[in-house]
UniProtKB/Swiss-Prot annotation:
Pfam families: GATase, GMP_synt_C, NAD_synthase. GO terms for cellular component: cytosol. It catalyses: XMP + L-glutamine + ATP + H2O = GMP + L-glutamate + AMP + diphosphate + 2 H(+). Catalyzes the synthesis of GMP from XMP. One of its GO terms (molecular function) is ATP binding. The gene is guaA. Homodimer. This is GMP synthase [glutamine-hydrolyzing]. Pathway: Purine metabolism; GMP biosynthesis; GMP from XMP (L-Gln route): step 1/1.
């Protein structure tokens, strides 16, 4: 049994980052709504509790409060931003609406050598004061600390920027240690989790495999399992883990909708059927999908058609496997958190969150989600340990509807063929061009890169003749969380090389453009 950290969510946009930082310290953590029952908190038996930030103000009535059980557990508690304010208010301090709001970088002075911050600093002033570069995002502030608390840090505009009760091991930070902008944020969270809470750093993917395999075997027994294999990271890792656990009791259904990347279907079959020995039913349904998409130009309509047809094809194939009792899905922890919703009780039913959602009821199958406790980076690490090729595990995100939403307007087979080849040239070039400063490929330096087919023709000149052919747009972005993104400043030499290859090798395309839009205002995908 792993030591656990309980994170109570008060509505912050970055609560997931808290859990990720804790797990990066090799300690298991879970996020639950702030209003969970006292019995749930006690049964969870955490080594410590972290209270997230949130958009509310404790100065108003009917705003979220920390369950009293948290303060009665006898374990360390860390309040972040709103979590600190709620702690201060409920334990006898005073919080007021701040007249000077703090949003962005701030430099705070650490005080009183508390166990949370002692020895942690970014620089020292000439007077010898330890200073921290942190990220603030708050309006309200603590005016008076509760009894038993001492000042831990301050800024000019926020005299009580952090506070500590060393006797009860209660701590409050007005800044956000979970974001990368707080330079020593990871060190602070590690100090709290490992030293103050005393949690054992034993959450590691190598150990997780053994635990997950044992759990799957106990859950499934001798029954058979079906998994919809898309070729994406989540379903691929789920397939590898399930096969490790139950072998031939697993059957994967791989639906090829004709909108995959170049040679992707062959690569999936080679990896799973040939290399790993997984039973895979390969269904080439491209004719059906393309027929249903004929004449459809609206992006949302295309998504719905592809999603509905996938369910139809999968259901038909799954129905043939009469001995199957379980449907496996590649649900991961962010899906679970998002499905639970903000401010919902932890005991509420969490809906399935995948492109085959709803199928368990339709097929009368039990639901199996072997990755539901893991973040994406943990899923990738697990995939490599299970023997999947790193090139597959660390591939850029690819939308469920595939090229269907990277072909603007109507989807046609010849458009898909042109785009597949252009996209493959772009990705291959990104993999082979190395950045001299970092020594990394430009594929690894970008978070997502792809080509988009534009259904417009432009005039060109090839040899002695004029051409009238299609246009392809290239898109490459860099991002930490995909909520915002910057367009990647790819070398001109790389872009020129890609353009020349596409125009020379892909007959039907005579113009290549590069998208230099950020998110916002643009989205990463074009549709």
């Amino acid at each position: 049994m792993h030591d656990k950290i309980l994170i109570l969510d008060f509505g912050s946009q970055v609560t997931q980052l808290i859990a990720r930082r804790v797990r990066e310290a090799n300690v298991y953590s879970e996020i639950h709504p702030y209003d969970v029952d006292a019995s749930f908190i006690r049964d969870f038996a955490p080594k410590g509790v972290i209270l997230s930030g949130g958009p509310s103000s404790v100065t108003e009535t009917d705003t979220p409060r920390v369950p009293q059980a948290v303060f009665e557990l006898g374990v360390p508690v860390l309040g972040i931003c709103y979590g600190m304010q709620a702690m201060a208010e409920q334990l006898g301090g005073k919080v007021d609406i701040g007249h000077l709001r703090e949003f962005g970088y701030a430099e705070v002075r650490a005080r009183n050598h508390t166990s949370l911050l002692e020895g942690i600093s970014d620089f020292t002033t000439p007077e010898g004061h330890g200073m921290l570069k942190v990220w603030m995002s708050h309006g309200d502030k603590v005016l008076e600390m509760p009894p038993g608390f001492a000042l831990m840090a301050s800024t000019e505009s926020c005299p009580i920027a952090a506070m500590a009760d060393e006797t009860r091991h209660f701590y409050g930070l007005q800044w956000h240690p979970e974001v990368t902008h707080t330079v020593q944020g990871r060190a602070m969270l590690e100090r709290f989790v490992l030293k103050i809470c005393g949690a054992q750093p034993d959450w590691e993917m190598g150990h997780y495999i053994d635990e997950a395999v044992a759990k799957i075997r106990e859950q499934v027994g001798q029954e058979h399992v079906i998994l919809g294999l898309s070729g994406g990271v989540d379903s691929s890792v789920a397939a590898a883990l399930l096969h490790r656990a139950i072998g031939d009791q697993l059957t994967c259904v791989f639906v090829d909708h004709g909108l995959l990347r170049l040679n992707e279907a062959e690569q999936v079959m080679a990896t799973f059927a040939d290399h790993l020995g997984v039973k895979v039913i390969h269904v080439d349904a491209s004719e059906v999908f393309l027929r249903k998409l004929a004449g459809v130009t609206d992006p949302e309509a295309k998504r719905k058609i592809i999603g509905a047809e996938f369910v139809e094809v999968f259901q038909t194939e799954a129905g043939k496997l009469t001995d199957a009792k379980w449907l496996a899905q590649g649900t991961i922890y962010p899906d679970v958190i998002e499905s639970a919703g903000k401010g919902k009780k932890a005991t509420q039913t969490i809906k399935s969150h995948h492109n085959v959602g709803g199928l368990p009821e339709t097929l009368n199958l039990k639901l199996l989600e072997p990755l539901r406790e893991l973040f994406k980076d943990e899923v990738r690490e697990l995939g490599v340990k299970l023997g999947l090729p790193p090139a597959m595990v660390y591939r850029h995100p690819f939308p469920g509807p595939g090229l269907g939403v990277r072909i603007l307007g109507e989807v046609k087979r010849d458009f898909a063929d042109l785009l597949r080849r252009a996209d493959a040239i772009f990705i291959e070039t990104l993999r082979t061009f190395i950045d001299k400063e970092t020594g990394k490929s430009w594929y690894d330096l970008t978070s997502q890169a792809f080509a988009v087919f534009l259904p417009v023709k432009s005039v060109g000149v090839m040899g002695d003749g004029r051409t009238y052919e299609y246009v392809v747009a290239l898109r490459a972005v860099q991002t930490l969380d995909f909520m915002t993104a910057h367009w990647a400043h790819l070398p001109h030499e790389l872009l020129g090389h890609v353009s020349n290859r596409i125009i020379n090798e892909v007959r039907g395309i005579n113009r290549v453009v590069y998208d230099i839009s950020g998110k916002p205002p643009a989205t990463i995908e074009w549709e």
